[in-house]
A protein has these predicted regions:
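Short, glycine-/aromatic-enriched active-site segment of Class I SAM-dependent methyltransferases
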Residues: 144-163
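Conserved alpha-helix/loop element of class I SAM-dependent methyltransferases that forms part
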Residues: 21, 28-50, 60-64
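N-terminal, positively charged/glycine-rich alpha-helical extensions of SAM-dependent methyltransferases
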Residues: 1-22, 31
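Conserved Class I S-adenosyl-L-methionine
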Residues: 181-252
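A short glycine-rich, Lys/Arg-flanked "PGG" loop and its adjoining helix->strand segment in the class I
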Residues: 125-141
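A short acidic, Gly/Pro-enriched loop at the edge of an enzyme's catalytic core
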Residues: 105-117
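Class I SAM-dependent methyltransferase SAM/SAH-binding core
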Residues: 50-107
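Short alpha-helix
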Residues: 164-179, 211, 218
Length: 252
């Protein structure tokens, strides 16, 4: 037991940078949805003259699509360490990095019709603001983690999803109410698994809102039960949910 606890505490101390889970490669295994958000985003960027990537993290995902960037690229991010990282990675490439508190769903610091493409991968958004900042005929593409993601995992730690209303159906209603036409809307559920308990520790520390105040010390009993489950050959497999929406602002 002592060896496991020390190993888990070591995972707890590992740094997490940007929105990069490569540290868990081979230890967190996730089913893939039937669509490819990067491929769709790249196609839309090649047709655009301007794009804003909402909630870019450290810019790691956007950099992977650099060959498809339009002439004007703007990103927003609200977590200060990620803002700094995004500026270090993107500003010298001509990308405008803006610190915007998307979690508050307030106004974005952009003019009406500023962009003909708005991208959003796993970040909050205000439907009215998306519609306002889109040019006529512009496209909004978003992939979201369903608010009920991993609720079976969270329940083990006595936690509940904080945004259970973040669903495809609700998002479609909000976007349509803002005046956007839904081009595509896809829902998906699958499974994701961890190969060891330490990977769960790292994951929950990296995303602190999943289990508030999580630590090895405060949740040791749950971690020990997960270790016992693994040793019984039951696996550490949980429910994954995502959805994708492409919406368009009407032409003038």
């Amino acid at each position: 037991m002592a060896m496991n606890v020390e190993s888990w505490k070591n995972e707890e101390r590992q740094p997490f940078v940007g929105w990069d889970f490569s540290y868990l490669e081979g230890r967190m295994l996730e089913d893939l949805p039937p669509w490819s958000y990067p491929a769709r985003a790249a196609t839309l960027m090649r047709r655009a003259s301007s794009v804003v990537d909402m909630g870019t993290g450290g810019g790691e995902r956007l950099l992977e699509l650099r060959v498809s960037w339009p002439p004007r690229v703007v990103v927003t991010e609200d977590y200060p360490p990620n803002v700094t990282l995004a500026r270090e990675r993107l500003a010298f490439l001509g990308v405008e990095v803006r610190e915007v508190e998307l979690t508050r769903h307030g106004p974005m610091p952009f003019a009406d019709g500023a962009f003909d493409l708005v991208l959003n991968r796993h970040s909050g958004f205000n439907s009215e603001e998306v519609a306002r900042t889109l040019a006529a005929g512009g496209i909004f593409l978003t992939q979201q983690v369903d608010g009920r993601w991993a609720q079976d995992l969270l329940a083990l730690f006595g936690a509940r999803p904080q945004w259970p209303d973040a669903t495809l159906a609700n998002s479609v209603v909000w976007l349509e109410a803002a005046g956007l036409a839904i081009v595509a809307a896809e829902d998906w559920s699958g499974r994701f698994a961890f190969t060891d308990v330490g990977a769960i520790v790292y994951y929950l520390r990296a995303i602190p809102w999943l289990v508030p105040r999580f630590s090895v010390d405060t949740h040791l009993a749950v971690l020990m039960e997960l270790q016992a489950r693994l040793e019984r050959g039951e696996g550490l497999c949980f429910e994954a949910r995502k959805f994708l929406i492409e919406a368009q602002k009407p032409e003038r």
